[in-house]
């Protein structure tokens, strides 16, 4: 990082106020003042009072198998690493990965709408059951493999497919809601 940048981790902003020509962010442990602020907080931009009722809070879910045994790798065959990624952000992704963590398969194919941005354990349990079925349908020859981890992640979509991006007020910018294509669209938007 540049010597002109200070990094404050685990410092949630509780308030953001315009003080003169600067912006002041209040955290549980203090205040940070800056002339310019970029809110890169995805769907949490609504908690700052912007883009109210224009964003959809979706969670997508993935699961990863346990390490494949040498026999399972032989049964699966093919290349050690491959992936199928959909053009639709909510489509199914399947990847075979290899590395320090062993040979595994990752599947992602479920989503839920969570306007409160807080999915619960029963949702994750339902997703796991769905992933187990999807995995066994796609890889019937690997019926003994278990899914070792299942997780979810927040994906913000806008109602009009436009990013929540730009200058909100003098010195206050938003870089939020990339509609499922964060790396690509975030780079394009600067």
Name these PLM-found stretches.
Residues 1-35:
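Helical element adjacent to the flavin cofactor pocket in flavoenzyme catalytic cores
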Residues 13-15, 31-71, 75-170:
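Active-site substrate-recognition segment that forms the wall
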Residues 26, 108, 175-176:
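Beta-strand residues in well-ordered beta-sheet regions across diverse protein folds
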